[in-house]
């Protein structure tokens, strides 16, 4: 196999592997285009949450997780790439281009992360009574920082304020018929390869300090009697509030989440409070105005006595990877 053929195969495989990435409501709002010497990441407007995410914050964060997954997949195959973010100001859907590909030594750490992609999932159940080791928090924080964002661990008073803020955001969205219609749509799409099936949604609200999202309908996931006393809450944030920074926030989320998976720490992203402008501003005040909030994260150790929820469905590779330019 020629090096050109090896490269296009690696690019296609990296794009397919990126399909494991998490996304808001499992919308998977991305599409990849494989070129002879590059890989392009594009957003898909049809899978944007136009009611709850009109500016595309969470769309860009979601696509950023896929971008980071693809970067790791290439490194695991022995390829180094240069990332061009938002390379064409006249093409808003083109979010990133992986280019200037060079063969290099296979990265064992990236290979381990690719394995973590296949087991990573969102578990909305309360966490166990086992505390998260401080060393794990430090390692997760370093992974986020390496991608240009920050992870602020919240103290007890800040957690209570986040809880009130999340509750208020949920109330605001519950009173918005467009948001409720949108949520109903994405919780009834599992047979299409996107959305959230009943098996991953709580059958009743969890007894946690920071409330989870009200999905508008009960699911089939038992919550159990646990609480979140041993959970660690953190805020993913950065210096800017622009599309480039939202994309990088997704890359940082992916890096932190995969690191957490490797360390046996569960992660639940809580996005409702950043979807509502007023509550997003409240979160910013917790940062003393020194950054912009991207997501609230709950970190914890899952209860080993109960099996976790299944993985959410995924679109097929053919639906998200365009290889027509290299056939």
Q: Model-found features: residue ranges?
A:
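Acidic, surface-exposed loops and disordered segments
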Residues: 1-327
């Amino acid at each position: 196999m020629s090096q050109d053929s090896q490269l296009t195969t690696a690019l296609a495989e990296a794009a397919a592997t990126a399909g494991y990435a998490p996304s808001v409501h499992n919308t998977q709002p991305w599409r990849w285009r494989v070129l002879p010497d590059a890989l392009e990441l594009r957003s898909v407007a049809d899978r944007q949450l136009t009611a709850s995410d009109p500016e595309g914050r969470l769309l860009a964060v979601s696509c950023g997780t896929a971008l980071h997954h693809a970067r790791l997949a290439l490194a695991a195959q022995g390829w180094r790439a240069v990332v061009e973010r938002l390379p064409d100001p006249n093409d808003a859907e083109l979010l990133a281009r992986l280019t200037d590909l060079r063969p290099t030594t296979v990265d064992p750490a990236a290979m381990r992360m690719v394995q973590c992609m296949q087991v990573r999932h969102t578990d909305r159940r309360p966490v166990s009574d086992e505390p998260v080791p401080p060393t794990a928090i430090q390692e997760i924080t370093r992974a986020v920082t390496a991608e240009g964002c920050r992870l602020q661990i919240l103290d007890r008073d800040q957690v209570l304020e986040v809880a009130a803020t999340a509750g208020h955001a949920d109330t605001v969205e519950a009173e918005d018929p467009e948001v409720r219609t949108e949520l109903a749509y994405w919780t009834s799409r599992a047979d299409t390869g996107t959305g959230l099936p009943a098996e991953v949604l709580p059958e009743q609200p969890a007894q946690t300090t920071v409330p989870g999202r009200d999905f508008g309908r009960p699911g089939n996931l038992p919550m159990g009697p646990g609480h979140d006393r041993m959970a660690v809450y953190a805020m993913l944030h950065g210096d800017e509030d622009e599309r480039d920074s939202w994309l990088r926030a997704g890359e940082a989320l992916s890096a932190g989440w995969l690191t957490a998976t490797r360390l046996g720490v569960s992660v639940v992203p809580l996005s409702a409070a950043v979807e509502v402008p007023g509550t997003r501003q409240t979160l910013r005040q917790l940062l003393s105005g020194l950054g912009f909030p991207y997501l609230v994260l709950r970190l914890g150790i899952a209860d080993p006595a109960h099996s976790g929820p299944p993985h959410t469905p995924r679109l097929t590779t053919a639906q998200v990877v365009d290889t027509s330019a290299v056939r």
